[in-house]
Amino acid sequence: MMNLISFETPPLGRRSQDGGSSSSSITAATTTTNKAKEAASHLDLSLGISLSPGGGGGDAGTKASSCCYGGGGDGGGCMGSGMLTAGVLGVGHGGSSHDNTTASSGGGGSWTAAFMPSPTGFMHPWSLAARQQKAAAEQERSGVARLPPATTTYMPRAAATVISLPAAVGWPPVHTSRRNLVATINNVLKPDTTAAVKPDRPTQATAMFAADETTAPPPRSAAAATEASRTLNMFAKVHMDGYKVGRKINLRAHRNYDSLRRVLTKMTHNFFCPADYSSTNKGEEDCAKSDEFIFLYEDFEGDRMLVGDVPWELFLASAKRLYIAKNPAPRNKGTYRPLVWICMLLPKAPY
């Protein structure tokens, strides 16, 4: 006996409802996937990298922009998967751009592979590496254009050697060469204080050295002796009324006015007798009481002044000549003639 199996057929409305729900769910999933792929492709286009891990992202169809210079070139489309594929630039006459298709990366790769250079040797024109290469190429071209002529001069190796200066020593840090230069200048300008110059009169020490030549002091240089004589010797001319011949005395050999007056007073007794500096104490009383003559000096302005009015150092600095004149008003006569005194002090007018 045959058993009849009944096949239940779902109602038409229920089947269509079930089919519609399944198809709508599939459509929604497909739409979500497409939106995600489109967003990823847009992000890839903006960043120039692929963010899909493993390179397994959906295909992003992009048309590559093409430019042709100098001829009828035609652009071609580029299909990319994973990595972004940029446009192809065709340069030339009658050239045509070809289709570029980049294969997607193998599964299981890291997303950092997007930062590695493309296997096809492509580089994004706006990337940092591309700009660096462009700048290097421009610099190289400009350097080639600025090359000097073929005549090249070669410097010897010895000339290129840098001479090292001595190290700075002390504080402030000054090089040794400059310190030696300053020391040399100071030694030249420093006066010789060890050499003491004495007056022109003979002394006991000089006589002892003259007697024993073996122990005589070393001679000084001529320049040092001349400089010392200029500072310690100051000779001035002495004129006396009634004598056409003058005398010279060393003013530096005297320390004050009294010593100078004694020498000049001795000249009044015997003008041509040489002045004996060793016997200055002889006849001091007679010299002090004598007022028959007066002593004048001529300063640097040419005026005649009375000896003893200014300090001794100022007198040595300004005295050029000495005059022995007769006293217009001696004590023994007791008369004073100011007119004659003024006439004697006035310089004679040239004829």
From Swiss-Prot:
Keywords for the protein's UniProt record, in alphabetical order: Auxin signaling pathway, Nucleus, Repressor, Transcription, Transcription regulation
PROSITE patterns tied to this protein: PB1
GO biological process: auxin-activated signaling pathway; regulation of DNA-templated transcription
Region of interest (Disordered), ranges: 1-37
Tissue spec: Expressed in roots and seedlings.
Cited SUPFAM superfamilies: CAD & PB1 domains (SSF54277)
Keyword Transcription regulation: yes
Induction: By auxin.
Subcellular location: Nucleus
Role summary: Aux/IAA proteins are short-lived transcriptional factors that function as repressors of early auxin response genes at low auxin concentrations.
Subunit structure and binding partners: Homodimers and heterodimers.
Extra facts: Lacks the EAR-like motif (domain I) which is conserved in the Aux/IAA family.
Protein name listed in UniProt: Auxin-responsive protein IAA27
Gene behind the chain: IAA27
